[in-house]
Amino acid sequence: MTTEKETATPADVEVASQEEQIDQTTEAQVEEPSIEAELAGCYAKIHELETYIAEADKREQDIQLRAQAEIQNIRRRTEQDIEKAHKFALEKFAKELLTVVDNLERGLVALDTAVTDEKTQALVDGVEMTHKEFVSTLAKFGIEAIGEIGDVFNPELHQAISMQPAENIEANHLSQVLQKGYTLQGRVIRPAMVMVAA
């Protein structure tokens, strides 16, 4: 009994060899597109990840810039608040002191009409010195009086009680100051109560 291998002719061997080569070539061709497709997919994924990283970097830079700007704004507002606190810390205290100045001025007006002898004049001189020293001390801390007869009426600084005709005073100028106003570092803490020339 002979086997097929023994009876195979050289032509059969060659055909079998060619079939093997075709199978290997087909497998290689099948594998090559598969590898190329996989490689193309990897490149696409790499490009997608690079794009994502670039966008994430931009977002991070934007967040960082916004955070720095916010920090600068907070720092600036804090400095302004501290400056205002220092500048206007005396406001409430100063408002209370203004009544003392008003009373000293009223006392001086009353004493001017009542001076009859040297003892009374000494009292007037003492009150005047106290008043001047008190006003000088207020000025050292930025508290200034506003509202003099003849000044131009300014609604931001003056509170008009009424308007009346006045001799020797132009219209819209102060004809009478009923109560002096005061500013603290340029900010009005009490407007002057005035009469305005019509």
Swiss-Prot record:
Main location: cytoplasm
Domain of life of the native organism: Bacteria
Regions annotated as coiled coil: none
CDD domains (alphabetical): GrpE
GO molecular function, one term: unfolded protein binding
Keywords for the protein's UniProt record, in alphabetical order: Chaperone, Cytoplasm, Stress response
Phosphoprotein is among the record's keywords: no
Annotated Pfam families: GrpE (PF01025)
UniProt keyword Transmembrane, yes or no: no
Annotated segments matching region Disordered: 1-32
Family the UniProt entry places it in: Belongs to the GrpE family.
Subunit and interaction comment: Homodimer.
NCBIfam families membership: PRK14140.1, PRK14150.1
Protein name: Protein GrpE
Species of provenance: Haemophilus ducreyi (strain 35000HP / ATCC 700724)
Taxonomic lineage of the native organism: Bacteria, Pseudomonadati, Pseudomonadota, Gammaproteobacteria, Pasteurellales
Gene this chain is encoded by: grpE
